[in-house]
């Protein structure tokens, strides 16, 4: 597998092989591929250190910024110290965080339920962007149980537009087959069509490219993602993968072989670092889950080198983004408190109530008008407190909005 030599390149290029069938019309109009289809549809329808034990308390909530449907006045036009780190139009949430609300029966509860009511509530909180985690909701909600269709996407788009929200991505269908079966390829294209109707710039998955630790398997994953990325690129969509902690562990790429002929030692490169090197930067993108990246920082700080020596290498999530900034258009922004018992270093909590230093992370990463942080908290839904997830979504929004640049 030959590495791509320009991992920072972000231009789409003019390679005819990457062009779609509507290029002549699109170019005559002077608009991008994604915006072309999206507009037609609308008209028709952390830090460097290991876990920060004893870190600063939670950010104070700033609740004076919400007006109407979240169109707050953040006065974030300043420069340097004190600058808002995440502009209002970049503040998003993955709907997995409030999955209990979208799945709630509107006939059995007065709380917001189904996509339409949840969109309304999130807009009131101040959010401007959402990332989908599939298109299913309760069957009694407007539109029915599944909106995973062209018609369903048009309905979702109308609700997003009603509440001033923008769809920025989806954790959805990535074919399991490789080489791609005809059926998987058609299903993938259907999801790209849905993404375009919804106005998304990005489409991806909540899973790692592979769960393997071996270079050969990551080479196969890179081939697959390069092909899927080219298909998505032709439809004007940036295809992205999402990480958990294991993907930032060390790649096994040398040393003695085990009894199955597989390498047992590492050169010190992390799996997703290698993936960045061997995927095409024009067509494959990443969403860093900052919580899981910090778990990886806690768990994977030594490796056995090819010569058998033990070497230390602390993971720097922000540093990796800085070196590959345009490859990371999306983040999952979720927080954690220190745990000494769960083996991960952190327990998830609402954003801004934990110890992960997001002020430093976003200050180092910069490019605030490019990155799209999506609030996520796996633990927000509660079996005993049905209002909790949307309530915590508000807490998380306020803390994200309160972040100011560190010099």
Task: Indicate residue ranges for each PLM-predicted region.
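N-terminal export signals
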Residues: 19, 23-30, 35-57
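Catalytic domains of carbohydrate-active enzymes, especially glycoside hydrolases
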Residues: 113-135, 198-199
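Acidic/histidine-rich catalytic cores of soluble enzymes
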Residues: 232-350, 355
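N-terminal secretory signal peptides
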Residues: 1-31
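C-terminal segment of N-terminal export signals and the immediately downstream linker at the start
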Residues: 53-96, 100
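Active-site acidic/histidine proton-transfer and metal-coordination neighborhood
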Residues: 41-42, 51, 175-285, 295
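Acidic (Asp/Glu)-rich catalytic clusters
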Residues: 82-87, 119-124, 145-168, 187-199, ...
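Short, acidic/polar
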Residues: 105-122, 181-193, 313-320, 358
């Amino acid at each position: 597998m030959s590495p791509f030599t320009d991992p920072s390149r972000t231009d789409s290029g003019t390679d005819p092989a990457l062009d779609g069938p509507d290029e002549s019309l699109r170019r005559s109009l002077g608009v991008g591929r994604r915006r072309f289809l999206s507009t037609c549809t609308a008209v028709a329808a952390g830090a460097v250190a290991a876990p920060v034990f004893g870190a600063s308390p939670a950010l104070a909530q700033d609740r004076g910024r919400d007006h109407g449907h979240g169109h707050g006045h953040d006065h974030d036009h300043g420069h340097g110290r004190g600058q808002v780190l995440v502009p209002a139009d970049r503040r998003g949430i993955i709907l997995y965080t409030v999955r209990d609300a979208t799945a709630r029966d509107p006939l059995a509860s007065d709380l917001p339920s189904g996509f339409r009511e949840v969109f309304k509530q999130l807009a009131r909180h101040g959010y401007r962007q959402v990332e989908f985690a599939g298109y299913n909701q309760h069957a009694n909600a407007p539109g029915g149980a599944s909106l995973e269709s062209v018609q369903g996407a048009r309905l979702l788009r109308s609700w997003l537009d009603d509440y001033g929200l923008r769809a920025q991505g989806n954790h959805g269908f990535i074919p399991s087959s490789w080489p791609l079966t005809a059926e998987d390829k058609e299903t993938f294209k259907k999801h790209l069509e849905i993404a375009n109707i919804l106005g998304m710039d990005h489409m991806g998955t909540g899973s790692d490219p592979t769960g393997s630790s071996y270079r050969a398997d990551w080479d196969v994953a890179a081939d697959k993602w390069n092909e899927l990325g080219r298909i998505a690129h032709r439809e004007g969509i940036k295809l992205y993968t999402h990480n958990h902690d294991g993907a930032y562990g060390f790649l096994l790429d040398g040393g003695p072989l085990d009894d199955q002929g597989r390498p047992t030692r590492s050169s010190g490169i992390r799996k997703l670092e290698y993936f960045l090197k061997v995927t095409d930067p024009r067509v494959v993108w990443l969403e860093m889950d900052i919580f899981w990246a910090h778990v990886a920082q806690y768990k994977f700080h030594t490796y056995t080198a090819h010569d058998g020596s033990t070497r230390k290498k602390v993971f720097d999530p922000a540093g990796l983004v800085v070196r590959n900034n345009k490859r990371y258009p999306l983040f999952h922004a979720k927080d954690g408190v220190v745990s000494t018992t769960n083996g991960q270093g952190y327990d998830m909590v609402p954003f801004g109530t934990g110890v992960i230093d997001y002020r430093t992370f976003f200050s180092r990463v910069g490019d605030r008008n490019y990155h799209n942080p999506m609030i996520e908290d796996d633990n927000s839904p509660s079996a005993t407190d049905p209002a909790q997830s949307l309530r915590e979504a508000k807490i998380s929004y306020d803390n994200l909005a309160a972040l100011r640049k560190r010099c």
